[in-house]
Design a protein with these regions (language model features):
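N-terminal cap/lid segment of alpha/beta-hydrolase-fold proteins
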Residues: 1-28
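Conserved alpha/beta-hydrolase
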Residues: 45-76
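Alpha/beta-hydrolase fold nucleophile elbow
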Residues: 105-116
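Alpha/beta-hydrolase active-site loop
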Residues: 82-102
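Alpha/beta-hydrolase-fold enzymes
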Residues: 122-209
């Protein structure tokens, strides 16, 4: 039976915020890879991928970002980075986490792989702190959405002012994610866009960390 090398760690970030990090270590790694998850998911969703990386001699780790997974602290706190400067705080989180593991493993190359929202955060990290990692990978990234993006930003800021930063917004969630399933022919669920593997889709739908409605200030960020 394969030895389970997975464990969790608490990390105190730059402003004192506690972050939960998922680890999949290997002895004498030839590479470190920092997995940055997307919106409405969490680090442990990458467990199978991380175990595959382990077989290649790669040490993988994935934090639950602010407002996500175990870092959120409770289900009610999912869906919000922070009341102020949330995006920048998360970017600094990624910098601090990466530097910690790089310093513990000198002379071993570090890769940051950002998926979806995580790819946007990683792109911000490169702009602000380009020397953080040796290599970067963007998965399911995108270009500027144009008019739709400006409209969404206006709605997010208006909703945040009118209804409060911590109020959940199904409208904004629909604007961000509602188009994805339309590209799937004969979908069986509203989350078929997650994967062509039906078991992965089912697991996502049944994961309470993945099915929460996010809050106005998150969309402002």
């Amino acid at each position: 039976m394969e030895k389970d090398n997975y464990f969790l760690e608490n990390f105190t970030s730059h402003d004192g915020k506690n972050l939960v990090i998922h680890h999949w270590p290997v002895e004498k790694p030839k590479m470190l890879i920092h997995l940055v998850h997307g919106m409405s998911e969490h680090g442990y969703r990458y467990h199978d991928f991380a175990k595959w990386l382990n077989k290649k001699g790669i040490y993988a780790y994935a934090p639950d970002l602010r407002g996500h997974g175990k870092t959120a602290g409770s289900m009610e706190d999912i869906g919000l980075f922070s009341i102020k400067n949330g995006w920048n705080k998360v970017v600094k989180d990624l910098k601090g986490i990466t530097e910690k593991f790089s310093s513990k493993n000198p002379n071993i190359p570090t890769v940051i792989l950002g998926h979806s929202m995580g790819s946007f955060l990683t792109r911000s990290l490169i702009i602000d702190f380009p020397e953080t990692a040796n290599h970067y990978i963007f998965s399911a990234t995108a270009s500027h959405p144009g008019l739709k993006g400006y409209l969404g930003s206006f709605i997010a800021k208006s909703n945040s002012l009118l209804f409060g930063e911590k109020t959940k917004s199904r409208l904004l969630q629909l604007l961000v994610m509602g188009e994805f399933n339309k590209k799937i022919k004969k979908p069986k669920t509203r989350k078929d866009w997650i994967s062509r593997d039906e078991s992965v889709v089912k697991k996502y739908i049944n994961d309470p960390y993945c099915m929460q409605v996010f809050k106005n200030q998150f969309f402002v960020d």
